[in-house]
Amino acid sequence: MENSSKEDYKIQSFDLETQKLLKTALKDPGSVDLEKVSSVIVDQSLKDQVFSREAGRICYTIVQAEAKQTNGSVFRRNLLNRLQQEFKAREETRKRSTQEWVCLVSFICNIFDYLKVNNMPMVALVHPVYDCLFRLAQSDALKNEEEVDCLVLQLHRIGDQLEKMNVQLMDELFNLLRDGFLLQEDLSSMGRLLLLEILEFRAGGWKLSDTAQKYYYSEVTD
């Protein structure tokens, strides 16, 4: 029950007609244009950071409802097609707007987190997610706190799952992050702190010790 109220709450940022469309899609997906629904969700995710982190739950509910109602996957197919388009244009998006780029990464990672096939993450999303995270680990992105913050947040959410899908790529990603932390001189103090925290987080088996948690939490809030 808690989930449905959260979904309703997240839909409030849309106009009333779109809210109605989404509410219907959540309950009766066969009666609405699911291509339009997927476009609406992606469009909003690219401009609304809070929604981009929560949209996976709504997409998951619609996918489940459609499978149950018609045994179909129209919504998922349209969603993944649109994600593929946005993914291909990611560098242009990043140049145009850091905020839109960060929203795109959050959204792709959120879909990876929520949309499962037989309780496993979708293999088709593993490399796109890694590609986004590798882009955030490049030296020009590590200078930007907004991008570092996004990178660390995604690794907190899905790092463990992602590593299980491809440990070699995770090792390569963390080699980049370690080099950035040790060798890059133009990091902000907050960027450096966030990188140190995520390095420790993975080293601890994707969790922080109580002591480390208290330390980082106090540093971030100060």
Swiss-Prot record:
GO cellular component: cytoplasm; cytosol; histone mRNA stem-loop binding complex; nucleus
Record keywords, A-Z: Cytoplasm, Nucleus, Translation regulation
GO molecular function, one term: RNA binding
Stored SUPFAM superfamilies: ARM repeat (SSF48371)
The MIF4G domain, residue ranges: 3-205
Main location: cytoplasm
GO biological process: cap-dependent translational initiation; regulation of translational initiation
Location in or out of the cell: Cytoplasm; Nucleus
Family of this protein: Belongs to the MIF4GD family.
Quaternary structure and partners: Interacts with eif4g1, eif4g2 and slbp; probably tethered by SLBP to the 3'-end of mRNAs ending with the histone stem-loop, it also interacts with eif4g1 which is bound to their 5'-end.
Function: Functions in replication-dependent translation of histone mRNAs which differ from other eukaryotic mRNAs in that they do not end with a poly-A tail but a stem-loop. May participate in circularizing those mRNAs specifically enhancing their translation.
PANTHER family registered for this protein in UniProt: EIF4G DOMAIN PROTEIN, MIF4G DOMAIN-CONTAINING PROTEIN
Protein name: MIF4G domain-containing protein B
